[in-house]
């Protein structure tokens, strides 16, 4: 589970009914009190958390969790943001006080692909593939911290206004995403969900074949 918001986690109780074996990895902060401003609760339903806890199939993770030689989960909570992050009104309730969400509950799946064959060098090379949910800590920060060869996830750009045909924020994002590889093979990006259709189209014009859109049920070969 990428983070503790209802639109990502509330379906897990139903998932347990239709799947009788898979383990679910949830960060221990995912059961926190998360809101949009102070007006609307957007965290996972406490009843779902209870069902998950009692299922015996949930692994509650901390900042880093190693699943096996290829798969690991990390929060990057110990990292310092290099690029500014807009919380977009997302908060957490601590006691009786609402504060900007620190997104301690957000985690990323890192896949260390040790079997990829380079089409140019015809040799086996390692690749790092990162899966992010909504990238609340900032897609630019995540790329800076994890240095992926492939990144799949939402960019959380859906509220950025592109109606004028120009956006400083998206221009900066495209520039950084296109150059943040420093001697490595340039990162390939697949995006979806909270990026926004108009925002994706804006980025696509600037990132060209380095950015593709994903839809539910779609299969891509990376």
Question: Where are these predicted regions, by residue range?
Answer:
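Cap/insert and terminal regions of metallo-dependent hydrolase folds
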Residues: 104-108, 112-220
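Active-site HxH/HxHxD metal-binding segment of metal-dependent hydrolases
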Residues: 2-63, 77-85
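Active-site-proximal loop/helix segment associated with metal-binding centers of metalloenzymes
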Residues: 38-41, 63-126
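A short helix-to-beta-strand connector/capping loop
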Residues: 20, 51-57, 68-69, 185, ...
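Short amphipathic alpha-helices and their capping/turn segments at secondary-structure boundaries
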Residues: 12-17, 64-68, 141-146
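Divalent metal-coordination and catalytic microenvironments
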Residues: 3, 24, 70, 133, ...
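Short acidic/glycine-rich loop or secondary-structure boundary segments that cap or lie
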Residues: 34, 68, 81-84, 138-141, ...
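Hydrophobic/aromatic beta-strand patches that form the interior of the parallel beta-sheet core
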Residues: 25, 59, 72-74, 152, ...
């Amino acid at each position: 589970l990428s983070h503790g918001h209802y639109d990502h986690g509330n379906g897990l109780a139903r998932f347990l009914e239709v799947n009788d074996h898979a383990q679910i990895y949830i960060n221990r902060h995912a059961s926190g009190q998360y809101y949009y401003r102070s007006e609307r609760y957007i965290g996972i339903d406490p009843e779902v958390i209870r069902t998950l806890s009692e299922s015996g199939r949930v692994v509650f993770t901390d900042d880093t969790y190693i699943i096996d030689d290829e798969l690991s989960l990390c929060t990057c909570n110990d990292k310092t943001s290099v690029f500014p992050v807009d919380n977009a009104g997302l908060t957490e309730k601590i006691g009786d006080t609402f504060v900007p969400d620190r997104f301690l509950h957000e985690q990323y799946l890192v896949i260390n692909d040790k079997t990829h064959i380079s089409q140019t060098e015809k040799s086996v090379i390692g690749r790092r593939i990162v899966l992010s949910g909504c990238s609340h800590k900032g897609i630019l920060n995540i790329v800076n911290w994890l240095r992926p060869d492939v990144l799949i996830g939402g960019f959380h750009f859906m509220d950025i206004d592109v109606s004028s045909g120009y956006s400083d924020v998206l221009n900066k994002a495209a520039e950084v995403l296109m150059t943040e590889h420093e001697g490595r093979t340039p990162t390939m990006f697949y995006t979806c969900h909270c990026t926004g259709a108009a925002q994706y189209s804006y980025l696509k014009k600037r990132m060209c074949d380095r950015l593709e859109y994903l839809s539910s049920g779609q299969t891509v070969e990376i």
